[in-house]
Amino acid sequence: MTAILLVRRQPVTPIFFNQQYPTLVDICARWQLIYDANAPFELRFESDSLTLHKRDEPKLDGILVDFVTGAVAHRRKFGGGRGQSIAKAVGLKQGVTPSVVDGTAGLGRDAFVLASLGCTVTMVERHPVVAALLEDGLRRAYQDAEIGDWMHERMQLFHGSSLEALSKLEQEVDVVYLDPMYPHRDKSALVKKEMRVFQSLVGADLDADGLLAPALALATKRVVVKRPDYAEDLDGVKPSMVIDTKKNRFDVYVKAAMK
């Protein structure tokens, strides 16, 4: 699979950025982000990485997508491989490596885990700022000597407003993976920071229940929904099976056997 970027036209989004930085100007133009001196968020380039800052909380670190170093790299090397709960949930097993659409990509961490285990993954992200961060993370990953080759083959980004838009793609999808934004009770510094930034940027996934039906229509084998352990079933629909983890669970809606 070639690593392509499919852009769906969206309403313009206000953002603050340095207008004297040509690369930032180009990125904002491509993603229809318009300069606004009073915008609550700023995009910057720091150490060759596109970063998002909440302007009224200057002490917070910038948010970026990093597939090469840090926590995701550690998980790729030491995270348990196909024995991980997410791998079991999507149906990874010997001789079976499904194609996956991640319908709520966010910072792309779960998509990266699945790609590192061999899945071809299409990330869907509807918010243009988050999509811009994902694109930049992919750019750096594609250039990396260790992971660049397989990243090109296994991960692509689709900027669209809904899963229904993906049904127009002429490709069969085994699994649709969903992780709708849900209020977190976890008070760790990282979760507090990222949730504060993301919830104020994109808002809550108030239409999350509406994702299940198009996901079931698109997937040929199963839909996997990641939920906090205290959350109700998506759209009130009971899953075929549940895989529990320490703080979350994977609700699996099976349509057909993995082969």
Swiss-Prot record:
* Any one annotated GO CC term: cytoplasm
Instruction: From the Swiss-Prot or TrEMBL record, give the protein name.
Output: Ribosomal RNA small subunit methyltransferase J
Q: Name its cellular compartments.
A: Cytoplasm
Q: Which family does it belong to?
A: Belongs to the methyltransferase superfamily. RsmJ family.
Q: Which CDD domains match?
A: AdoMet_MTases
For this UniProt entry, what is the primary localization, expressed as one broad class? cytoplasm
> What is the main EC category here?
transferase
InterPro entries per the UniProt record, alphabetical = 16SrRNA_methylTrfase_J, SAM-dependent_MTases_sf
Q: Which GO terms describe its molecular function?
A: rRNA (guanine-N2-)-methyltransferase activity
According to its UniProt entry, the function of this protein is described as: Specifically methylates the guanosine in position 1516 of 16S rRNA.
Binding of S-adenosyl-L-methionine, residues: 109-110, 125-126, 161-162, 179
SUPFAM superfamilies from the UniProt entry: S-adenosyl-L-methionine-dependent methyltransferases (SSF53335)
Q: Which Pfam families does this UniProt record tie to the protein?
A: SAM_MT (PF04445)
Catalyzed reactions per annotation = guanosine(1516) in 16S rRNA + S-adenosyl-L-methionine = N(2)-methylguanosine(1516) in 16S rRNA + S-adenosyl-L-homocysteine + H(+)
Q: Does the keyword Transferase apply?
A: yes
Task: Identify the keywords attached in UniProt to this record, alphabetized.
Answer: Cytoplasm, Methyltransferase, rRNA processing, S-adenosyl-L-methionine, Transferase
Enzyme nomenclature, EC number:
2.1.1.242
